[in-house]
Structures are given as C-alpha cells and as structure tokens.
C-alpha cells in the first residue's frame, strides 16, 4: 500500500490484494505530499495446508466515527468477496479515538476531563460504529480488556491514552491476547549489538503492538 500497510507472514502468501478505502479526509489541501490514499492490504495465507485470510488496515484519524465505519465496511465487503468461507484476521490502526480528529476543541476537552478520557478506553464501541459493523458481520474484536494502544502527545505536555489498534477475528477463537509496550525501556528482549539494542529514542512507536494467540476453525461463541 502507499501508506505503509503491509502483511508479513512466516507462512506462504498465496494471493494478495490492495483495497482502496473511501476518502474521508483530503490530506492534499494543506499541501502534504502523498501518493495515493488510505488503503488496506488483504492476503490469503497457507497455514500448514489450511487457508487463512488476513488484512492490514489503517483507517482515517481525521474524521468521525461514521467515516471510519464507511472505510471499515469497504474492507469487510472485500473480505467477504475475496476470502469467502475461511477464517479471517483483520488487524491494524483503526483510529477508534471516539472523536473527530479534526476537532481540536474536542481533543482539548477530553484531555482536561478524566471522565471523557475513560470513554477513550472503556466505551469505544459506543462512539465508533466501525466496531459495531464488524460485530454485525460475526467478527470479534480483541484485545477485549480496555487498555491503551496509543499515546497521543498533548500540546501542554503529557499524553492522551487511546485505544486505536485491534485484531478483528472471524472463524477464529482467541485463547489469549494482549498488548506489547513499545517504550524502549520495556523492550528488554533486544539481542546484543542489534539495531534495537542501539536505539536511543524514548519509544519505538507511539502505538503499542497488539498480539493474540488463536485457534482456527472454531466458531466464536458470541
């Protein structure tokens, strides 16, 4: 994809597609130099002789929940068409921040209110119709524990904890799921003399990684 989307797999990739998402924000108007628009990368993997559909997704942050719903529905329709009848894992930064990323006043209001900050972690589905749309098509969102995956810096210092990154599972049952901190101090697994061991920044990313172990071909109880 043109916006950094990719699928990395230890299993053979049999087929792959790029799905263009409906535009919900024009990044060109302020002369940001970009190639293409938001997209998702879908692929079919061969996991020990069993097919598995996967997708790498990055939804728009500078829009409201309805805009993100329209974008995710485009991915859900593509998965139905391209990956029918097989287990599917859709994952990525869905930007489910519970507000319109263009609304600076709303961001300041949330930053100053502990009650509003809690909604960004605990009540995401009430404000983000994309998650409801996925559930309606038999996808299960993980991690289910309300935990931040994004540290959004605030103008006055500090950061706003957001829950933006998800795995959406169809035909899969998660046995466990969690997030992995990308703060450099938490990355104690670096091999000596590796690029990670030499990295001197405060964090590898402002998003934490989302991780899950799943069983294939087991119908979700939900």
Give the positions of each predicted feature.
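Short catalytic/ligand-binding loop motif for oxyanion handling, primarily in non-cytosolic enzymes
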Residues: 1-5, 16, 25-26, 62-64, ...
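Metal-dependent phosphoester-hydrolase catalytic domains
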Residues: 79-89, 96-222
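Structured beta-strand-rich core segments of catalytic domains in phosphoester-bond hydrolases
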Residues: 1-51
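Short, solvent-exposed aromatic-acidic interface loops
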Residues: 20-27, 60-61, 181-193
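Conserved hydrophobic/aromatic beta-strand scaffold that supports enzyme active sites
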Residues: 5-7, 40-44, 56, 165-167, ...
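Active-site-proximal beta-strand/loop segments in catalytic clefts of secreted hydrolases
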Residues: 11, 19-21, 57-59, 91-95, ...
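His/acidic metal-ligating clusters that form di-metal
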Residues: 39-55, 65-106, 128
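Short coil/turn motifs at secondary-structure junctions
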Residues: 59-62, 217-219
């Amino acid at each position: 994809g043109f916006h950094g989307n990719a699928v990395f797999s230890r299993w053979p990739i049999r087929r792959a597609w790029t799905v263009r998402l409906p535009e919900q924000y024009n990044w060109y108007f302020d002369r940001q130099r970009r190639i293409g628009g938001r997209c998702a990368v879908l692929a079919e993997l061969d996991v020990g002789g069993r097919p598995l559909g996967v997708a790498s997704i990055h939804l728009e942050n500078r829009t409201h929940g309805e805009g993100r719903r329209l974008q995710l529905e485009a991915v859900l329709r593509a998965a139905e068409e391209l990956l029918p009848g097989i287990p599917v894992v859709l994952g990525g930064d869905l930007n489910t921040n519970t507000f319109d990323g263009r609304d600076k006043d709303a961001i300041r209001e949330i930053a100053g209110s502990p009650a509003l900050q809690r909604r960004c972690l605990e009540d995401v589905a009430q404000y983000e119709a994309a998650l409801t749309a996925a559930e309606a098509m038999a996808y299960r969102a993980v991690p289910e524990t309300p935990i931040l995956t994004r540290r959004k810096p605030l103008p006055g210092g500090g950061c706003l904890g957001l829950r933006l990154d998800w795995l959406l599972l169809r035909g899969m049952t998660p046995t466990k799921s969690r997030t992995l901190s990308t703060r450099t101090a938490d990355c104690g697994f670096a091999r000596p003399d590796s690029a990670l061991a030499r990295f001197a920044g405060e964090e590898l990313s402002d998003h934490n990684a989302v991780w899950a172990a799943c069983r294939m071909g087991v119908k979700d109880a939900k």
